């Protein structure tokens, strides 16, 4: 039997963190997302438009909830002193997570960020986050870097996840199943020519790579095919030229991923609607979380509620 629980979805993007918690029977009681195009995609798939700027929303106006979810941006805490207290985080979006945790004290939370958060600002940013959550009163705080490619998605995408519980719990992150992956599993059989990159773009991409190699630093266009185990990380700038993940084609220039393939690469279900332009779709999937990783974590969190 599914457990009944409530949750809120902050910095929701297009709802990648929400999907597995919905699947487990959770009831989402509040959502916030600033970007108007992400709001459109969210509304098309979940039937509700997220509230806008979280910095303008009073924590008292957010309903009570069991779990807080949030994939927040990585920002330095400019004044973080030795004490690394709550007020040092003012002016950053983490402060908004902290004030909501402090007011509502949900049973659990899940935060997601780039892998670099741990070393950001010589480790001060991460230390401050943990210190503030401790100050609020959370007894269990665990963090782990997990890779989408170890959870059945053919993409090398590392992210840090922070899970906390108000009470002491013996929480452990899921052990990555490391199921073998193959890029062909998410590629479409037939793709329109519009996704093939132009001669000019292909020539300039190869030239940039050659120059970068001569100077001794990495620049990637990265070329993949159906047999590739996984791609490099898809970023929000993929829409610009697609050079970070190019797919080989016989007797043609390489091509970009299609929005449908970008969706699959992040583990979103095939029924997930894309009501926005291709440019926005690439940005949204590039910013999204790998759903299969969240699915594995969500089961562990709900079990401990």
Task: Write out the residue ranges for each language-model feature.
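Class I SAM-dependent methyltransferase "Motif I" SAM/SAH-binding loop
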Residues: 11-14
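Conserved SAM/SAH-binding beta-strand->alpha-helix loop
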Residues: 35
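Conserved SAM-binding loop
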Residues: 42
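Class I S-adenosyl-L-methionine
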Residues: 57-67, 75-239
